[in-house]
Curated annotation (Swiss-Prot):
Pathway(s) where this gene product acts: Amino-acid biosynthesis; L-methionine biosynthesis via salvage pathway; L-methionine from S-methyl-5-thio-alpha-D-ribose 1-phosphate: step 4/6
Entry's Gene Ontology BP terms: L-methionine salvage from methylthioadenosine; L-serine biosynthetic process
Family membership: Belongs to the HAD-like hydrolase superfamily. MtnX family.
NCBIfam families per the UniProt record, alphabetical: HAD-SF-IB (TIGR01488)
Protein name per UniProt: 2-hydroxy-3-keto-5-methylthiopentenyl-1-phosphate phosphatase
Gene3D superfamilies: 3.90.1470.20, HAD superfamily/HAD-like
A GO molecular function held by the record: magnesium ion binding
Enzyme class: hydrolase
GO CC annotations, alphabetized: cytoplasm
UniProt gene name: mtnX
The reaction(s) this protein catalyses: 2-hydroxy-5-methylsulfanyl-3-oxopent-1-enyl phosphate + H2O = 1,2-dihydroxy-5-(methylsulfanyl)pent-1-en-3-one + phosphate
Length: 210
């Protein structure tokens, strides 16, 4: 069966939680109030993330992209993407974070053209405050990862993630690579996963398995 890889961005491709860090930087008081509720899953991602982003003035958008510019990526991504290209395996980023931040980091690394597709949150900056736009919103998520995955049927799905935004993606995937908070969530639900720390490890696992 052919394969497809779905990968989170913040804290997964980046070595630090870029999106959460940005929210703490540009909306510190509201982040301190809302983010614990999202991690505890007492507030939906859709409502919490929208509220946080739409509290930030539009004039800060350039600063947000500059904030992302300096954030390091996790080791082995370039090699992993080269491996996937050799195997003709699509690599799709699905993120609850900002599309512009994702593209900024990938351009810096020279990897933007190695990615099959990117699904993230778009921001409108014409008004006084940022306005959130997502084509993949559902009742609980601004970017409904399982809904996007459902577009790609008849293939083995591989998910790579690290946190609360990746739970629905992990539930739907045939094979899950998890780290950080996502491990705790999956253990609580008795969901199988493979722990990982860098993309070299994922490449090695897939090589040995095949």
């Amino acid at each position: 069966m052919s394969k497809i890889v779905f990968c989170d961005f913040d804290g997964t491709i980046t070595a630090v939680e870029t999106f959460a860090g940005m929210l703490k930087e540009f909306a510190p008081d509201l982040s301190a109030q809302i983010m614990p509720q999202m991690y505890a899953r007492t507030l939906t991602l859709r409502r919490g993330v929208r509220q946080l982003l739409e509290s930030i003035p539009s004039q800060k958008y350039a600063d947000i992209l500059a904030y992302a510019e300096s954030k390091p990526i996790r080791p082995g991504l370039a090699e992993f993407l080269a491996f996937l290209q050799e195997q003709s395996i699509p690599f799709i980023i699905i993120s609850g974070g900002i599309q512009g931040m994702i593209e900024t980091v990938l351009k810096r690394e020279g990897l933007l053209d190695k990615v099959t597709a990117i699904y993230g949150v778009n921001l409108h900056t014409q008004g006084e405050y940022l306005q959130v736009h997502s084509d993949w919103e559902n009742e609980t998520e601004l970017v409904a990862k399982a809904l996007i995955m459902a577009k790609y049927s008849g293939v083995e799905t591989i998910a790579i993630g690290d946190s609360v935004t990746d739970i629905t993606m992990a539930r739907r995937a045939d094979l899950v690579f998890a780290r950080d908070r996502l491990i705790d969530y999956l253990q609580a639900e008795n969901q199988p996963y493979i722990p990982w720390d860098n993309f070299f490890e994922i490449r090695e696992y897939l090589l040995l398995r095949d």
